[in-house]
A protein has these predicted regions:
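N-terminal binding-site loop/beta-alpha segment at the start of enzyme catalytic domains
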Residues: 1-69
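Short charge-dense sequence patches
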Residues: 9-13, 43-49, 79-90, 146-147
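Alpha-helix-loop-beta-strand connector modules within alpha/beta enzyme cores
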Residues: 29-36, 57-85, 128-143
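Acidic (Asp/Glu)-rich catalytic clusters
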Residues: 40-44, 61-75, 96-107, 159-163
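Glycine/proline-rich, positively charged
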Residues: 86-168
Length: 168
């Protein structure tokens, strides 16, 4: 892994500033070609890992493929799936499919999106309920499990409970 990772929030239109900014970003990067040029510039400096919501932004995978074709270099894909964490058999099947889709896209690392993981957090017991089930699904799909985290407790509880998490 490189020390620097390409983050795709801005590229995908998640400015966290305003709807107008988000629309401007999506308009600027409405094709895989414009996104590919960004990836190619990073690859020029051996920054070869990309983190994003590949199931949400349909330009990311084609842009990865274009950048790889144009540079002859491979990008490490770190996918942040949105998974259904409801405690039902149907939700688990839906989550499993979302995780398997990450593997099909070629992700090496799968980090369920923070908004999903945070729903499982129990501050009283200092646990992340059912997290081991999702981490096992990630391993079964052949990827390295990680967690997207905006809350410090996600990292703290995962480490404290020795969950099978390799990166944050």
């Amino acid at each position: 892994m490189p020390r620097l990772i390409i983050g795709c929030n801005w590229i995908s239109g998640f400015s966290h500033m305003s709807d107008a900014n988000d629309k401007w970003i999506r308009m600027t990067h409405e094709t895989p070609t414009s996104v590919s040029k960004i990836f190619e510039k990073f690859l020029e400096y051996d920054v070869d890992a990309v983190l994003g919501l590949f199931s949400v932004d349909k330009n990311l995978m084609p842009a990865v493929q274009l950048a790889q074709e144009h540079t002859g270099k491979k990008l490490i894909i770190i996918d942040e799936p949105i998974i259904n964490v409801d405690d039902t058999p149907a939700a688990r099947q839906e989550a499993k499919k979302a995780i398997q889709d990450c593997a099909k896209r070629g992700a090496s690392i799968c980090m369920p999106l923070h908004s999903c993981v945070e729903q499982l957090l129990n501050k009283n017991t200092k646990t992340i309920n059912r997290l081991p089930d999702y981490l096992e699904m990630i391993r079964e799909a052949g990827m390295i499990p990680g967690l997207s985290a905006h809350m410090p407790e996600v990292v703290q509880y995962a480490d404290y409970n020795e969950y099978d998490v390799e990166t944050y």
